[in-house]
Curated annotation (Swiss-Prot):
PROSITE patterns: RRM (PS50102). Pfam families: Fox-1_C, RRM_1. Predominantly expressed in muscle and brain. It is found in: Nucleus; Cytoplasm. This is RNA binding protein fox-1 homolog 1. Binds to the C-terminus of ATXN2. GO terms for biological process: mRNA processing; nervous system development; regulation of alternative mRNA splicing, via spliceosome; RNA splicing; RNA transport.
Length: 397
């Protein structure tokens, strides 16, 4: 019996040895303590006291079970270090542009403020000159240039002031804009560059007709060529100027392409319109049809006005004298007034050589010769007014 007890005791002592060895399948290992949770939490123990039941700490910190081959202590340092490194990297990347932006913006502002700036000053007193404008704006900063715009009559009431520093220019604009100087409210604005456009050259001849800017009348090409056909004012009851029955012009304006012609007095629907009008048409380049020997007072063909004169005529034609060789011209853009009310006050200007433009050769008695002298005076006055003051030099702009 004693032997059996000793044998059993030895078996019990031998069996106790495996308890000290590592078990192949350990119990569940919990994650390392986080956020102040005590380390004893990993050991199996009862739940916390009832007063902590309201706090849901377990869902916030989920517990992951790891097999015994892997221990959480081996991976957590690498994971946490990777997270911290990546977090610091993103912070530095985000902070880089914020650090660089304040450095570039002040440099740009300083460059803009150091550039010169030009101001446009309008509605300034007309007696102001450059020193006056410089004195007005000089209190705000250094001025590079002052310019007041003038024409032949004096100041135009506006000018330009160029500051060396744009900040000074802005301050001057804010202070002086809208201020009253000698009863005039001046305006100060930033000067802008003017867009230069090429002005179209206006042809003085509009379909062969030239506009006189002084008198405001319209003259035909025959007037410049010396071939002027005056209306029969005697038939209309006008006694201001009366043309002779036939006039011969022996000279024309040099360089003008239209030929001179032996002229007859022209009559063109004056009884219908209240004034005499000469008859031309440029749209008829070919020779006109043969004349109809009717209505002897009418000289040139024109379908439009022939309808007014003839009324029921089937073919709107009227007589044309055979010796007339002048080309046909149009008055569709204006009217010819043989007697302008301003011409009696205009004397012929000898410097323009208008006396050589028309030489009259009277063919009849002394009465016709006197008529020719009157007509020559009128023509000289008309032609002198054409070249007198073609442009107004007192235009404001």
């Amino acid at each position: 019996m004693n032997c059996e007890r000793e044998q059993l005791r030895g078996n019990q002592e031998a069996a106790a040895a495996p308890d000290t060895m590592a078990q192949p399948y350990a119990s569940a290992q919990f994650a390392p303590p986080q956020n102040g949770i005590p380390a004893e939490y990993t050991a199996p123990h009862p739940h916390p006291a009832p007063e902590y039941t309201g706090q849901t700490t377990v869902p916030e910190h989920t517990l992951n079970l790891y097999p015994p081959a892997q221990t959480h202590s081996e991976q957590s340092p690498a994971d946490t270090s990777a997270q911290t490194v990546s977090g610091t990297a993103t912070q530095t990347d985000d902070a880089a542009p914020t650090d660089g932006q304040p450095q570039t913006q002040p440099s740009e502002n300083t460059e803009n403020k150091s550039q010169p700036k030009r101001l446009h000053v309008s509605n300034i007193p007309f007696r102001f000159r450059d020193p006056d404008l410089r004195q007005m704006f000089g209190q705000f900063g250094k001025i590079l240039d002052v310019e007041i715009i003038f024409n032949e009559r004096g100041s135009k009431g506006f000018g330009f002031v160029t500051f060396e520093n744009s900040a000074d220019a802005d301050r001057a604009r804010e202070k002086l804009h809208g201020t009253v100087v000698e009863g005039r409210k001046i305006e100060v604005n930033n000067a802008t560059a003017r867009v230069m456009t090429n002005k179209k050259t206006v042809n003085p001849y509009t379909n062969g007709w030239k506009l006189n800017p002084v008198v405001g009348a319209v003259y035909s090409p025959e007037f410049y060529a010396g071939t002027v056909l005056l209306c029969q004012a005697n038939q209309e009851g006008s006694s201001m100027y009366s043309a002779p029955s036939s006039l011969v012009y022996t000279s024309a304006m040099p360089g003008f392409p239209y030929p001179a012609a032996t002229a007859a007095a022209a009559y063109r629907g004056a009884h219908l319109r209240g004034r005499g009008r000469t008859v031309y048409n440029t749209f008829r380049a070919a020779a006109p049809p043969p004349p109809i020997p009717a209505y002897g007072g009418v000289v040139y063909q024109d379908g439009f006005y022939g309808a007014d004169i003839y009324g029921g005529y089937a073919a709107y034609r009227y007589a044309q004298p055979t010796p007339a060789t002048a080309a046909a011209y149009s008055d569709s853009y204006g009217r010819v007034y043989a007697a302008d009310p301003y011409h009696h006050a205009l004397a012929p200007a000898p410097t323009y050589g208008v006396g050589a433009m028309n030489a009259f050769a009277p063919l009849t008695d002394a009465k016709t010769r006197s008529h020719a002298d009157d007509v020559g005076l009128v023509l000289s006055s008309l032609q002198a007014s054409i070249y007198r003051g073609g442009y107004n030099r007192f235009a404001p702009y």
